[in-house]
């Protein structure tokens, strides 16, 4: 299928400013962006269909670099709680009641929300084999999937079973080119050194990266210093974890040395600004990490703590929170936030041919309707995305040249069934 977006405003990479907007034609041939420029037809493109780009904005699809998709079931059910109370006293007891069907529909709900708000790829940490990966696969989104790994010692049978869950999903869904996999040790406070070493051995054996929660709370730092004699970042670095492609979620409580280590090792730091603020964990040192060259990307975390998976909200918040916290209007710019939410996020997930609008790259695209009072006059399209848009201006979403949503119509997912099943599940779990 050859699709032409005719005369559409596109957010394109720009060496000087990061991004610039240009009215142009964008041609998609099967799964790939084949042409960006003036008059694609005159330049030899033969479209099967042409989409009028007037009053529309097209950008690379957004990338959610940290979430727990199945936890969309827990939206608005664990609020105004401090982090450890939220996790251990509220979330984990509800997780114990989940069935495979619950997690399937919770994940479908997450995928539905992400599609409707312009996300085309995400990094997931989950708690079960098959049902979650199956739901993601059926959605059409791209995803890097990690089974959350908890264990004590190399011989922990439960810990070994969780590793096998990862390998099972890899074998079962390995033919789906939109899916990648990572090892997902949950955190240093739910694993010990022996188990982490086993996880790294398996990561090396299968050529996988690592997805881990890191330095999320003050308590995590204090406990690590007491137990390990150093920060969580230093502990994992000394262990050799950062020799792997690593995505470290949160990275809120970092020392200068920690930031230097992350920068030197090329670790992707997935900041979750809304979730971290809501759970009282504070603000990550984003301006300092940017200055040091840390690879920063943005995640929403789960709907159980955010309470949405809307990347527009987190792009907005990361800019505003750090401007206010640093008392500097230049602390984090809209263009920096958009890069975190697209290009850097895609690389964090291991998708090297997406995240920007560029010829030869995957046609993972988000199209917005800009005829809203809150967006007009647009003036600066990147600023409009970060400071004015809600996310529900998204009109169409394409992955590998396939529309997952077109003119706000979702393809291939039963919205009403998803809503019904998720509400039914929560009445049983927390009714």
Predicted regions and their residues:
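Metal-coordinating catalytic core of metallo-dependent amide/deamination hydrolases
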Residues: 131-252, 257
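C-terminal cap of metal-dependent C-N hydrolases
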Residues: 362-419
